[in-house]
Each structure stands twice: as structure tokens, then as C-alpha cells.
Amino acid sequence: ERRSLAGIPRAYQKYVGHDNNRDFYMASQAETVNMNRVLYREWFPQIVYNHHQTGPPGTVMFAPPFRDPINYVFDPLIPAGINLLGAGMHARFAAEGKRGVTMRDGSSYSTWWNGGLRTTAYFHNQIGLLTETIGSPTPSDIPFIPERQLPTGDLPFPIAPQRWHFRQSIEYSITCNLAVL
């Protein structure tokens, strides 16, 4: 049975709904104020990893490296660290036989938008990672996208069109977590 959020009487965040992930540059909401306090005044993590939805059509996930050109205002260690961790993720996916993870020009993500959780981390000399993964509790189909059927530099291990289940998305996220650790 298809699930629906139509019966929910209100947004799950009173003022910004799902856009609270875009509030990190301004910190106008209680959630982002608290996260910024923890990230930049208390914990000082070396890596900030944001799991997000949804992946590009014809793939399962987008994972770093991000597309060029890189934002030149960051210390060179930031994009180098992002690229190294991204390479570790992609190597682990290949080793585990998990197909359909794209990078760089496989999607629109870059280091130039500075309002989100992973991008504000760059200004604190922290490596910010973002993955965008398909899937929800309702099974969905990976569509046939002709240009995503053959391996490329940005999609070295393509995935065939198929039915996709949320558990598979969780398994991909776990692979990324282990690669980062």
C-alpha cells in the first residue's frame, strides 16, 4: 500500500518545514542554533557528514567528490579531504559490489553553495560531506536512463533499472559510514 503524508495536519517544523537544512548560514531556527553551537563551539569535529535524499535519476546515490570548479576560498586541505573521503566511499561501494553511485558531474552538487550543514563546515576547517540517496519506505523503481547505463568517470559502476527498497538505501548509507570511519 502506498504511504501518504496528506493526513499530516502541519509541517513538521513550525516555521521552515523541511528547509531547516538550509538555515546553517543564518541560524534563525532553534535546531540550527543548537547544531551550530555543538559543531563550532563544543565538539569541533573533523568531518561533518550529511545524509540526504534524493539521488539523481538512474542512480542510487550521489557521493563526493563534488563537481568542478571547486570553491577557491577554502584552504586546499578541505577539497583534498573531501576528494579523499569520496574516493574511499566509491572504492568501498565497488568492493562490496554496490552499483549506481555517481559523483562530480553526475549531479549538480558543488562546494559553492554555502548555506547548508556540510558547506558551513568548510568555513570552520572541517570536511563537509553530502550524500543524496534514493528511497523511502514505499518501494520505488530506478528508471532507465540511457546515458547512465555504461560506465563513465562519474559513474564507474552503473546500475540496471530495477525495483528499489528502503533497506537497500540504508545498506548504502551504512557503506558510506564505514568508509568515512
What are these regions (language model features)?
Residues E1-L181:
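Structured catalytic-domain cores with a bias toward divalent-metal coordination
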